[in-house]
Amino acid sequence: SESYPIDCEAFMKDNSGKYVKYLWDPNSYINIMVYNFTTEPNSNSVTLGISHIPFSTTGKHYLEGLGETDYSHLTLANLQFPLCVSINSLYINEESTPTEYSTADIVVTLAHELGHYLGLHHVFAETDNGTCEDTDYCKDTKRYNKQEYDSNCDYIYENEREKYTFKNLVKRTGCDGIEFISYNIMDYAISYSN
């Protein structure tokens, strides 16, 4: 039996084919599902959205970092999982104002998740060992260690509250050691893109 709220990870990873009936033709539409996501009782984080990364055709036009397929045209019959973007309905009305920044801004969340759906990865290094590597497959984007950034933000919040400002929080130290300001929608930490 189905339950509500819905576990977004389980929904997105479901390979039984039972959710494909909710999709429209993936060659003509981007399917966006809006529902209440379950939350872990002891978690301090909230999932605002989640998306599938697209497929790339096998062969000379394959794009690194994407799932490979032999199909150049997907049909619903080719799918066993819900190829879509999922948005947490609890935050559907959240938005920033000219004077107040909201980390749950629906416009930013949707733009970010659509970026994933179209093949973009996070700009920060996503490694289990905390190393600063290029994991977004785009050589021209500045990358940084997000674990280190988050630790620095926590430290500033706890010990130097006067420095906990938007102007300071958009700054990053790149993997090359050079400071830069984040303007990239695929960086879901505080950024001018948001």
Provide a role label for each language-model segment.
Residues S1-I156:
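Metzincin-family zinc-dependent endopeptidase catalytic domain
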